[in-house]
Amino acid sequence: MAKQIIFVQGAGEGVHARWDSKLVASLERELGESYAVRYPQMPGEDDPDYAAWRAELISEFDLLEDGAILVGHSIGGTILIHVLAEQPPKFRPGGLFLIAAPFIGEGGWPSDDMDDRKDFSERLPPGIPVYLYHGADDDIVPTAHVHLYAKALPHAVVRVFEGRDHQLDNDMSDVARDIRLLD
């Protein structure tokens, strides 16, 4: 049976179909048939509401089994880690992969929906491997955000790619390599 991955999209009009679908296609190509990537369209992608995305993620979590890999891009990664910190899922995640995720709180972005968190290490499911990725040429989320997450998650693996943008130039080969390392 194929190993499960859920990919949580970023926000913005048409992001699911026009932008993050390219990341998913790259990930599927790099990982091959041994992995099955779920790519749900999140509600109100052009103006995400935390409560609505949270409810959607919790529903998606019910479909996942122990060892499933969680991947979030941009605000999808931000919401994913906040949901995990608030309400650990019933399954045991095999890994958490955040790509160009905005950090909410001091030094990062403000939010009316999400609490500032500095306690991710204590709140995430115990032992979950965490990987943080960011393109150094990201013109949407400053690279400083990945370092804020790194401070909140000292056990995380951090990868910053020179010359790559918010979409990591639609190249998920490094993410796929790290996912395969968990097997």
Q: Which sequence ranges carry the predicted segments?
A:
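Catalytic histidine-centered segment of alpha/beta-hydrolase-like enzymes
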Residues: 48, 164-176
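Short beta-strand/loop motif that positions the catalytic acidic residue
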Residues: 126, 131-134, 138
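Acidic catalytic loop of the alpha/beta-hydrolase fold
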Residues: 14, 136-141, 166
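A conserved short beta-strand
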Residues: 90-104
